[in-house]
Amino acid sequence: MGSKDHAVFFREMTQLILNEMPKAGYSSILNDFVESNFFVIDGDSLLVTCLGVKSFKWGQNLHFFYLVECYLVDLLSNGGQFTIVFFKDAEYAYFDFPELLSLRTALILHLQHNTNIDVQTEFSGCLSQDWKLFLEQHYPYFLIVSEEGLSDLQTYLFNFLIIHSWGMKVNVVLSSGHESDTLRFYAYTMESTDRNQTFSKENETVIQSAYKSLIQHLEEIRVLVLATHFEHLKWNDMMEEAYQTLFLLQHLWSEGSDIQRVLCVTSCSLSLRMYHRVLVHSNCLSLQEVEDFCRLRCLCVAFQLHLPLSQRACSRVITCSWIRNSDSFLKMNKWCEYFILSNLNVFGCWNLNLNHVSDLYDEQLLKNIAFYYEFESTQEPHLNLGDSIRRDYEDLWNVVSHLVKEFNVGKSFPLRTTRRHFLRQEKSVIQEISLEKMPSVGFIPMTSAVIDEFVGDMMKDLPILKSDDPVVPSLFKQKTSDELLHWHAQRLLSDDYDRIKCHVDEQSRDPHVLDFLKKIQDYQQFYGKSLESISTKVIVTQTTRPKEDSSGASGEILQNTKPHQITKKSKKKSFLKEDQNKAQQNDDLLFSIEEEMKNNLHSGIRKLEDYLTSCASNSVKFGVEMLGLIACFKAWKKHCRGEGKISKDLSIAVQMMKRIHSLLERYPEILEAEHHQYIAKCLKYLGFNDLANSLDPTLIGDDKNKKKYSIDIGPARFQLQYMGHYLIRDERKDRDPRVQDFIPNAWQQELLDVVDKNESAVIVAPTSSGKTYASYYCMEKVLRESDVGVVVYVAPAKSLVGQVAATVENRFTKTLPAGRTLCGAFTRDYCHNVLNCQVLITVPECFEILLLAPHRQKWVERIRYVIFDEVHYLGREVGAKFWELLLVIIRCPFLVLSATINNPNLLTKWLQSVKQYWKQADKIMEEKCISEKQADKCLNFLQDHSYKNQSYEVRLVLCGERYNDLEKHICSVKHDDVYFDHFHPCAALTTDIIEKYGFPPDLTLTPQESIQLYDTMAQVWETWPRAQELCPEEFILFKNKIVIKKLDARKYEENLKAELTNWIKNGQVKKVKRVLKNLSPDSLSSSKDMVKMFPLLVEKLRQMDKLPAIFFLFKNDDVGKRAGSVCTFLEKTETKSHPHTECHSYVFAIDEVLEKVRKTQKRITKKNPKKAEKLERKKVYRAEYINFLENLKILEISEDCTYADVKALHTEITRNKDSTLERVLPRVRFTRHGKELKALAQRGIGYHHSSMYFKEKEFVEILFVKGLIRVVTATETLALGIHMPCKSVVFAQDSVYLDALNYRQMSGRAGRRGQDLLGNVYFFDIPLPKIKRLLASSVPELRGQFPLSITLVLRLMLLASKGDDPEDAKAKVLSVLKHSLLSFKRRRAMETLKLYFLFSLQLLIKEDYLNKKGNPKKFAGLASYLHGHEPSNLVFVNFLKRGLFHNLCKPAWKGSQQFSQDVMEKLVLVLANLFGRKYIPAKFQNANLSFSQSKVILAELPEDFKAALYEYNLAVMKDFASFLLIASKSVNMKKEHQLPLSRIKFTGKECEDSQLVSHLMSCKKGRVAISPFVCLSGNTDNDLLRPETINQVILRTVGVSGTQAPLLWPWKLDNRGRRMPLNAYVLNFYKHNCLTRLDQKNGMRMGQLLKCLKDFAFNIQAISDSLSELCENKRDNVVLAFKQLSQTFYEKLQEMQIQMSQNHLE
């Protein structure tokens, strides 16, 4: 096969791919149901993957198509948009498998004709130019491809596809090893890295040559194979023979037919003719025997035509194979099928029904028929076929006879005229179905208040096991290891809050601790004030009202006494003098503004607008506005008489119209006739005669002046095109007494009303629209009501907790009783004032811990409001399970905030149903409490009156309008320079999108873009009927209107969109396509190395005044590198200048201060050493501060060589107190990135990503807000949260994580409210197809996931039985069980959840966690504490109870408390198999592993652990199978009998008149809980007990999958049955204590590796603490071993982190 060099290259290419496999990330490949995830599936990889499924048997076409459709439906149901590509060259790989050639062709036909999937078959190969162009035009997120083919040759083809995709910067997703659930599709992603791209580029010539060599070799194989079967007939000859056969049939069946009949008769006739012509050898079947086989084939098709799937699923399973002599004919027949199917496209006009192209061959049915006629038909009486089957069979055979002209094929009966058996005679021919393995179907009787209320209605209809059933008595005699007898296994453990160490003792009265806490609070307030310039509000509790003045009349008498009169007069004089001074200052300021406008209009206008912002008097404002208008008018006349004769500067006209807009809209009551006349004059000079006449009809114009001063643009077009972002918005003018700082919009007022009425609300509003204000108003309300009420703010990520906490500390201050604080925080890493604060900032995971803790209910009852920010994370992969539970378990009002939800109505209705439940529950509990109170038995904590005042209404508050418009720009690189092209949002759309979905709700246009759309429409359709009506000057809302408002422009935009949609509806699709094409920018011009152009991009943005800007990237390493490259760019362009005296004066002043500090320190050192130490520290920080200022070189670095705001820097340096730099510099002094961040900050640059310390991130955030940094490179860490707005957002790196949701979140940062009227979004190095998809895609819909797990059920039962308030606990548990989003208005889903709940209880009883009353038993607390690691937590407890850890953990010597390294390594091995599971794709095991110390693949569990795990899995699997058997009784079997994607039904009336059918289809037992499609391959209910097949055979409509069973196999098989090894990163780290080697050998990135190791260390610590609490014997070997392991692992990790930090600093 080609040269030796090519063979070597094939191995090199294969090894490269294998080496990349440990680095493959296993995650959800579709980012949370986002439509922008367009990708490509390689059709042959899809075929090979489904062929390799363990439950599938070759020859069962219908089962195969079912598997294909299941795979595709899982992708589509999760929002996937894809194209399937079948390369022509890929056909060569199947010439040794002709049965797959016909199957592949049938698959293509099925997908093209029976589904809406886009199928591409025109590409010759993956190296063709057409394919390369396709990738460039569509730029898929990834390509799904198989890493292994059916042969080495096919594997090489897949390898070429993978390498080429990497070279085109397209990621690869492996088609095998995938899993899916109700929300997500998980698979392995192999990213296109620089290394892979380099390999592809450097070996481009070799790749082309090797590929051609491979295809040439495959072509040679094709010639040999055809010669074997058809001798001298070539490929084209066979294609012609197939065409002629079809042509003859078309004349016979001119009215049409279906594909099953057509293929049957044509393939049989063509096979017979070819066999007769070329193959009549002694070792093959005779011609008469071949005729018999074709008769059986025709009868089989007749069966397929008449038998519904329900009957065929009961077929006997024939295990014997065809005799070897029949191989030649069988392959020839398959070749003929392929040639026939390949010719079908030629007969396009023939009425051919392709619905059942998926059911062309059923080998099991054929074998059944053959077996009967060979072994069973000799017995009397013979079984009849039935009239309909017999008739169809005879028709088929008669057509075969007609098509075969060369010889007589005989009559249709008898079917067998020869004696040779086609099936081999074997001992066991028919597969026997044994149900002995299947468990007893039934539930152990249980009872409790929760169980009875939730599933009581269902229990009466379910099978209940009797007490004498062998399963029941065996449950309660489980042996526990003797070593555990002294353990308090039933003890409730402390929760995470108890174990997370606070930095200090918050209750301590130690002065040093109090001083430290005061410093923390001061810094938090400083941090908050830095993020937002809002003054602190003092909160006074409403119950503590100020005392009334008791002086009464005496006070008035005192005021009238002489001394008071004298004081009053003096004050009056003082006020008069002060007013005079202010008036004089005001006059001076106005004079300076007027002079400035004369000298520089635009500079003067900026000062004027600053003055207007600070001025409170309307009359003064009016006068200033008139002053500005007069100045603009004079400047316009002067300009037009001078430079304007050549080209007019319309910015002056824009400023003039801005003043006119403001005067007419804001001061109508002050305007008089003379003002109207002057404004009319201004309009006249601009050429707006109609507008001028509407103000002053008496105005006489001068035609000469008109031509000289006119802008020659209509007033409406001028306002839209040049004043779009200045247009006045319709805002309320009446102030709300509840809001001091601004006038709230109508929707904001509605929010305030919601909070005032104690209602709940779902708030959907764009970023920076002001929805966060409602959160702070809610906090203030709770703070004012009492000192005990709590408001909980749930942030989506822990990185935001510090930000929000700081803003709360800055906004509010309140005097509280001792032991209480205003604000607290709780994350898994940090807790501070959690239970004694009034405002708790936390994350979903930690809030869930508090809500489900039985002994935290008293604190939970204090919660008055919960605020959920960015709730669209309810649908995200990480943290989604917490959001849904929190929303249903809280009983207080809530605010749900989000900027991006596509289905807010559904979310609101669901939450309203939850609130209705709580309304009823609270009423019942209140009544019960009242009755119990009379008997002094009330334990209910709801006696607090605050719950009585809450409303149970849930409002939906929508705001669809951003305050600032966003303009999108595409960055291109041409001639080593960066250029910017405006991107019109409509250019992202297609006619198909508009026709199917309309315009995306958040795809809005700026007024300028609306004008551009109108002009393009008018240009494309010159005779457009509505062109005049929609012309800006004639549009009804614009005509003769002086002040066009933002709302008018929005309505104009809506009219244009509606009109464009109507064009499509009225058949003008081509015109719409031209419009969209004309709006699209030209193709992007890019450089080969866009990274090097990044600094130039930043510089160009600075020159255009588009800073501050956030540059979003998606790799932590790149974030720092790009920031560094920008700094280097500035250093190279730096020009030296001489320092000014002023700068030196600052340094001299600082030196004087330092000298004073030194002298003071000498005096104090002897008297007070501690105070001296404090001064020394201050001196060091001050010196560092001076050094920073000197390095800034304010006067040496020109404004062109720093991105900082020079004015902000000047202010910072001249400030004597509270310097920002002086506060933040010491905090990053010893951090890992501190030195680098300070160096970058001196140039106004920073970076921000998740791996930074929180102090480093705060450093960047504070300086960015202050203007000291104006260029920040960042990952998505700055996409969420608050207080980081900027003028521009730049997407500077593509990634699979750049989807529609993240795009909206990140782009929302652009445009600072109150500072920028327009936000800018730039795309740099992002492919144009990707940009279009981002803009055109809808935001994700929130969908419910499967809400229950075994451990969650255990935690709920713990809460119900151990809760401080039983009634409250019960109500919360039932709310969780009854109100999942998945089951909302879905009765069938609720039934499944109830059954799963029962299954969970049964398993918990059998594993001895619960008793029959639902109360917790042994180790329930331990299992529930490790709830985040199911099923590993259950397995761990199982091992512990069996005594396996006690057997393993033997001290080094008797009496010792230390354990050997060997014991520790074995313990790590066991725990890594439980808590450090990261699988590697199965194909990796073929790699040539040659590592000295580090092994990539984790070793198996020790034998005793492995045996125990097998027993555990078998027990769980049987219980789960029992659950599936019961659940299957209520599924919708009609849906189970249709293909899931094409919805083609295989239902119908069962054939009852055929004795043969009844005989063959007699196996109904054991096929209850599996899909009827999989029964065709001989699968039974027993396959539910096999881990490699359970997900493949389960009923799709049952609503669960095998992932819901808490199984943990020592190995994992992929879909093709190959074993997937575990990554040994944990054990290798423990052994070698080296992260670098792990990074290189184990294939995990450093950041990911560090995170996983930290999680593992946290788990060990949690287990160690738990065991210590459960065991009183502190010398217990297991307790000691885990303690030793926890300490050593933590020390190794700390040592490694310190080493990494030191290396970074060096």
Swiss-Prot record:
GO terms for molecular function: ATP binding; ATP hydrolysis activity; double-stranded RNA binding; RNA helicase activity; single-stranded RNA binding. Residues 1205-1354 form the Helicase C-terminal domain. SUPFAM superfamilies: P-loop containing nucleoside triphosphate hydrolases. It comes from Homo sapiens. Belongs to the helicase family. Its EC number is 3.6.4.13. ATP binds at A765, P766, T767, S768, S769, G770, K771, T772. This is Probable ATP-dependent RNA helicase DDX60-like. GO terms for biological process: defense response to virus. Residues 551-564 have a biased composition (Polar residues). One of its GO terms (cellular component) is cytoplasm. The keyword Transcription regulation does not apply. SMART domains: DEXDc, HELICc. Keywords: ATP-binding, Helicase, Hydrolase, Nucleotide-binding, RNA-binding. The keyword Iron does not apply. Residues 565-574 have a biased composition (Basic residues). It catalyses: ATP + H2O = ADP + phosphate + H(+). A motif (DEAH box) lies at residues 869-872.
